[in-house]
Amino acid sequence: MAEAGVAAASLFGADRRLCSADILPPAEVRARIEVAVLNFLAALTDPAAPAISALPLISRGAANRGLRRALLRDDVSSVYLSYASCKRSLTRANDAKAFVRVWKVMEMCYKILGEGKLVTLRELFYTLLSESPTYFTCQRHVNQTVQDVVSLLRCTRQSLGIMASSRGALIGRLVVQGPEEEHVDCSILGPSGHAITGDLNVLSKLIFSSDARYIIVVEKDAIFQRLAEDRIYSHLPCILITAKGYPDLATRFILHRLSQTYPNMPIFALVDWNPAGLAILCTYKYGSISMGLESYRYACNVKWLGLRGDDLQLIPQSAYQELKPRDLQIAKSLLSSKFLQDKHRAELTLMLETGKRAEIEALYSHGFDFLGKYVARKIVQGDYI
C-alpha cells in the first residue's frame, strides 16, 4: 500500500507544485537508473541510513490530484499531480512485491534502452511473466509498476523504451508525411482509415498538411467507419480520428500534435450518452490520472458535440438502455473529481436521474445517412459544450 507523506527532495530534480515527467534520451534514463541503484546500495551498506525502502514516488491518490486550469480562452486545462510522496516499502508485507516489481521493471528498461529497442506494455508483461512469475501475475501489475518507475525517474513512458499499443486510426482532409518521406493522403483511403503507429518517436516527426476546419474525435470504430463510408469530410471539411474505445496514448499524442499544428481548428467529440462516453471525452480533454506526470503533454481543448441530453428527443424510447453497475461506478468517480465542468456534471446528473443511457447508433432510426447530417448540423449551429 502506498503511504502518503510530505515530499522530500526527489532523486531527480527539486519537487515542484506541479510535478511532471521529462522526455529524455536513452543515455540519460540509463544514468538515472544507475543513480537509483547506487542510492539503494549505499543505503544497504550504511548502518546509519534510514529504511532501505525510500523510493520517492509521487502519489497518484485523490488528495494529490488537481486541474491545471486554462487562463485564456484557447488554453488547455490538464490533470496534474502535486508534490505529495508515497513509499514502496520492502519491510511492509503488502508493499514488498510492489517494491521488487519497481526494480524488475527498471532492470528490463535498462536492458531495452541499451539494445536500442522499443516494446509494448503487453510485450513487457509476457517477458516479466516468464522471468519473474511470482511478481507479475497480471497485466495490471506491469501497468502500475511502469507508472511507479515514471514517478521515480521523472521521465515519460516512451523515454523508458515502452511504446504505446495503438488501435487508433484517422481519415479525412489530411496529408501525412512520415520520416521516410512517404506521403499518405487520408482523404482517399477506405473507411478503415490510416492506422496510427504506437511509436511516439515516429509520430513526433510526422509533417501534416490539411485544409480541414474541424477535427472530430469519434469514440467507436463503427461510427468512425460509418462517417468515413459517407465521406463526411467531402462536404464538411474535417479530420476524423478514433481510438476505437478508450483513448490509447498514441491516439491522444497525434490528436495533441494536430491541435498544436492547427491551434485554430476546433476539436469535437462524438461519444455515447453514458458515463463511459463522458470519461473518454475527459481523458482526451484533461489527460488521465494514472499518467498524471505527463498528462499535460496530451491534453486538448475538446468540445462535446454529442450525444447529449438535448439530443434525446431524436432517439426512440425503445433505444434507451438501463445504466449498468459499471456506469454507476464511473459516474461516481467522475462526480468526485475536481475537473468535471458544470455542463458536463449536469449531463451526468441527468443520466443518473433518468437511470438511462443511449448509444450513438440509436440515431440510425432516422436512416443511415442521418448521422453525417446530425454532425454537420450541430457543428454549423454551434451546438456543443
From Swiss-Prot:
Coiled coil: none annotated. Its cofactor is Mg(2+). It catalyses: ATP-dependent breakage, passage and rejoining of double-stranded DNA. Keywords: DNA-binding, Hydrolase, Isomerase, Magnesium, Metal-binding, Nucleus, Topoisomerase. It is found in: Nucleus. Mg(2+) binds at residues 219, 272. Residues 24-169 form the Topo IIA-type catalytic domain. Pfam families: TOP6A-Spo11_Toprim, TP6A_N. Its EC number is 5.6.2.2. The keyword Isomerase applies. The keyword Membrane does not apply. It is an enzyme of class 5 (isomerase). GO terms for molecular function: ATP binding; DNA binding; DNA topoisomerase type II (double strand cut, ATP-hydrolyzing) activity; hydrolase activity; metal ion binding. The active site is at 126 (o-(5'-phospho-dna)-tyrosine intermediate). PROSITE patterns: TOPO_IIB (PS52041). SUPFAM superfamilies: DNA topoisomerase IV, alpha subunit (SSF56726). GO terms for biological process: chiasma assembly; embryo sac development; meiotic DNA double-strand break formation; meiotic DNA double-strand break processing; pollen development; reciprocal meiotic recombination; seed development. It comes from the Eukaryota. Interacts with TOP6B. Belongs to the TOP6A family. Required for meiotic recombination. Mediates DNA cleavage that forms the double-strand breaks (DSB) that initiate meiotic recombination. This is Meiotic recombination protein SPO11-2. It comes from Oryza sativa subsp. japonica.
